[in-house]
A protein has these predicted regions:
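Acidic, glycine-rich flexible loop segments
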Residues: 137-173
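C-terminal motif of bacterial Sec signal peptides marking the signal peptidase cleavage site
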Residues: 21-24
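Low-complexity, intrinsically disordered Gly/Pro/Thr-rich segments
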Residues: 172-188
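Acidic/polar low-complexity flexible segments
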Residues: 183-206
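N-terminal secretory signal peptides
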Residues: 36-113
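Bacterial signal peptide processing site
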Residues: 26-28
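Bacterial N-terminal signal peptides that target proteins for export
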Residues: 2-16
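Mid-length scaffold segments of soluble, non-membrane domains
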Residues: 85-151
Length: 206
């Protein structure tokens, strides 16, 4: 009987051990979308507030400019997009905040809808980027000059092989020249000026 009891408890212990090991080896649950955005924003604030030379915010201006201001997270601005070949000339010299011209190439036109409204934005790559790993999407909208920087905002996208993209305006950010005029910031071209306001992502401090 003792032997049988011992076997019973040994089997139970093994079951518990297997359960614990399975729990330890299983992947963590996915981070909720809103928490992902909040974490990203907190990390950016911490980086900008640091004494790292990578911070675009001068130490004397950090109390005035930080933490960064954002529109409330709105999943209606997190939409799928398809990249289609861009019409017109591929090459473009994009004017910048310091009076220079940045050489760009059109990667294609992103087609998507926000709040039921069909929209398009052209995605660009630096002319020197031959492998086109990252897409640069500068855009202007009706919030510029009042709620957001007058020179527009940016999105960055990892290039996909499918032409399908996850376009998330909650991740839209203002150019570094907002914090420091020494930065050279491209202005969105006419084709990327939206008539509707995009009240999502980074904004000016109220």
């Amino acid at each position: 009987m003792r032997y049988a009891d011992g076997m019973r408890w040994t089997g139970l212990g093994s079951l518990v051990l297997v359960t614990v090991l399975a729990a330890a080896c299983s992947p963590p649950p996915p981070v909720p979308y809103q928490q992902q955005i909040q974490n990203q924003r907190a990390a950016k604030d911490a980086a900008f507030a640091s004494d790292s030379p990578e911070s675009p915010v001068p130490a004397a201006d950090r109390a005035r400019l930080l933490p960064l201001a954002y529109f409330p997270i709105d999943e209606g601005y997190h939409v799928p997009a398809r990249l289609a070949p861009a019409p017109g000339e591929v090459a473009l010299e994009m004017p910048t905040s310091t009076g220079q011209r940045r050489k760009m190439r059109r990667a294609g036109q992103l087609r998507f809808s926000v709040k039921g409204q069909p929209l398009t934005l052209t995605a660009f790559v630096e002319e020197s980027d031959q492998v086109m790993q990252r897409l640069f999407v500068p855009f202007a909208d009706a919030s510029n000059g009042t709620e957001t920087y007058i020179g527009g905002r940016y999105l960055d996208l990892d290039r996909t092989t499918t032409g399908l993209y996850d376009l998330d305006f909650n991740r839209a950010y203002q150019p570094y020249c907002v914090y420091n005029p020494q930065y050279d910031c491209p202005y969105p071209p006419r084709e990327n000026r939206l008539a509707t306001p995009i009240r999502s992502g980074e904004r000016l401090r109220p």
